A protein has these predicted regions:
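Conserved donor-binding/catalytic core segment of Leloir-type glycosyltransferases
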Residues: 47-63, 69-72
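Short hydrophobic beta-strand element within catalytic cores of glycosyltransferases
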Residues: 153-157
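Carbohydrate-associated surface elements
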Residues: 4, 24
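Nucleotide-activated donor-binding/catalytic signature segment of Leloir-type glycosyltransferases, i.e.
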Residues: 97-115
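Short acidic/histidine- and often glycine-rich active-site loop of Leloir-type glycosyltransferases
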Residues: 20, 158-169, 173-174
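Aromatic "clamp/platform" in nucleotide-sugar-dependent glycosyltransferases that forms part
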Residues: 136
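Short alpha-helical donor nucleotide-sugar binding micro-motif in glycosyltransferases
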Residues: 114, 122-128
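Conserved acidic donor-binding segment of nucleotide-sugar-dependent glycosyltransferases
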Residues: 168-169, 173-179, 187-190
Length: 191
């Protein structure tokens, strides 16, 4: 849980005691080997010299996936090269894939589906330059901790529960809840 969850409970009248207990992470703190990186890049035909972003989680619109796709479409339209790994599955998967096609992002997005193998998951986090996690729905994003265990910073919405404890530019990156802000932050990071 998070401090933001407690604040929400207080707003609806909860007056009892509480304990804030952030999510733990069972992924070991590790660096992914050069061989593992090369294997994943070959598997998905990822060029060596492009920024690599990752979204990990359920494929549902209320996680603000549309903001990610709109920001990436802006980057593409500005002539920026990058790849976005979409790792997970969910009820809105087909609609998200349709939006990817509509935005002209098919050549930029790598769809992995659900990955259960923890070592393979480590590899995807490890090759990524940045986790994109603009969800304002999640109370305490486990994926942020998983990415951090692989030395991959996260881009989060300022003021969201997932962003609690993140220092902008030091332990992650913060933006406002908009595609333009995500794009601006990505442009700054890519420079």
């Amino acid at each position: 849980t998070s401090k933001g969850t407690v604040d929400s409970l207080r707003k609806v009248g909860y007056t009892g005691d509480y304990v804030v207990m952030p999510n733990g992470c069972d992924l070991p703190v590790t660096n992914v080997s050069d061989d593992d990186i090369a294997l994943i890049k070959r598997k998905h035909n990822i060029p060596n010299d492009v920024p690599l972003f990752i979204y990990t989680g359920r494929m549902i619109w209320y996680k603000n996936i549309e903001l990610i796709l709109d920001a990436c479409a802006m980057l593409k339209n500005e002539g920026k090269e990058f790849r976005l790994i979409m790792l997970g599955f969910g009820a809105d998967e087909n609609a998200i894939k349709k939006k990817i096609r509509k935005c002209g992002l098919s050549d930029y997005v790598i769809w992995t589906g659900k990955i259960l193998d923890r070592n393979e998951l480590l590899g995807y986090y490890g090759i990524s330059d940045l986790l994109l996690f603009p969800s304002t729905f999640d109370t305490n994003g486990l994926v942020v901790r998983e990415a951090a265990a692989c030395a991959t910073p996260s881009l989060l919405v300022r003021g969201s529960c997932a962003a609690e404890g993140v220092e902008d530019g030091k332990t992650g990156f913060l933006c406002v809840e908009s595609a333009h802000s995500i794009r601006n932050t990505l442009n700054t990071i890519m420079e």
